[in-house]
Regions:
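Short, surface-exposed acidic
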Residues: 1, 27-30
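Conserved phosphoryl-transfer catalytic core
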Residues: 1-8
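C-terminal cap/substrate-recognition subdomain and adjoining C-terminal extension
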Residues: 24, 31-181
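Long, charged amphipathic helices and adjacent flexible linkers at domain junctions
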Residues: 11-17, 179
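Cytosolic catalytic headpiece of P-type ATPases
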Residues: 17-20, 28-29
Length: 181
C-alpha cells in the first residue's frame, strides 16, 4: 500500500495483492474494523463547513467501500465511490471486483460527477494524499495535498501539513473556521 501511494508500484497490482490477503475474512471482522475506525482530525469540521457553504461532498477512495460508506455516514458525505469487496456466504472471497478505483478511475469519477451536477471543473476541489490521487487533483481547479506523500505535495496546488482537514478551508480562501450551527 505504501509503495503504491508513493507511486513506486502499480496501484492495481498492489490492490489485487491486498485483496487476495483478505480471503476468508468474515464480514463480522469488517464490522469490527468499522467500529474501530477513527476520523482524521478536522474531518467533521471540514465536512460540516463545506455543507454549510453549499458544497456537494464526494468521497473517492482507492480503499474499500465497506469502510468508506461507514465514514461517509458518520460525516454526512453526499456520495461515495470506492472499491467493492467480493463477499460470498459472509466472507471475503479474495477476488477483486472490477472496476478498480485507481488514479485514472478517480479522475473519471470526478469529471463525471461534475458533469452530472452541471458544474465546471473550475468549481471542483480535490484533496488527496497518495500518488493515485494525482490524476483527480490535476483535473480539479484546486488540488490540495493533505499530509501527503512527497510526490503529491510536489504537484499539488496547496498543501495542508500542520493542521487537520479543517486546514483545507484556508486553501479555499476561508481564513477562519466558519461558525457551524
Amino acid at each position: 500500500t505504501e509503495a503504491a501511494m508513493r507511486g513506486e508500484i502499480d496501484f492495481d497490482e498492489s490492490f489485487a495483492q491486498r485483496v487476495a490477503l483478505l480471503e476468508g475474512i468474515p464480514t463480522s471482522v469488517l464490522d469490527e474494523i468499522c467500529a474501530r475506525l477513527t476520523l482524521s482530525t478536522g474531518a467533521r469540521t471540514i465536512i460540516s463547513a463545506l455543507k454549510t457553504l453549499g458544497y456537494h461532498t464526494v468521497l473517492v477512495s482507492g480503499g474499500f467501500a465497506y469502510f468508506a460508506n461507514y465514514i461517509a455516514e458518520q460525516l454526512g458525505i453526499d456520495e461515495v465511490h470506492a472499491n467493492h469487496l467480493d463477499i460470498d456466504e459472509g466472507a471475503v472471497t479474495g477476488h477483486i471486483q472490477l472496476p478498480i478505483v485507481n488514479g485514472a478511475k478517480k479522475a473519471a469519477i470526478v469529471a463525471h460527477t461534475a458533469e452530472r451536477m452541471g458544474i465546471e471543473m473550475s468549481q471542483v476541489v480535490c484533496v488527496g494524499d497518495g500518488a493515485n490521487d494525482l490524476p483527480m487533483m490535476a483535473i480539479a481547479d484546486l488540488g490540495v495535498a493533505y499530509h501527503a506523500k512527497p510526490i503529491v505535495e510536489a504537484r499539488a496546488d496547496a498543501a495542508v501539513n500542520v493542521t487537520g482537514l479543517e486546514g483545507v478551508l484556508y486553501a479555499l480562501g476561508y481564513p477562519a473556521l466558519i461558525p457551524i450551527p
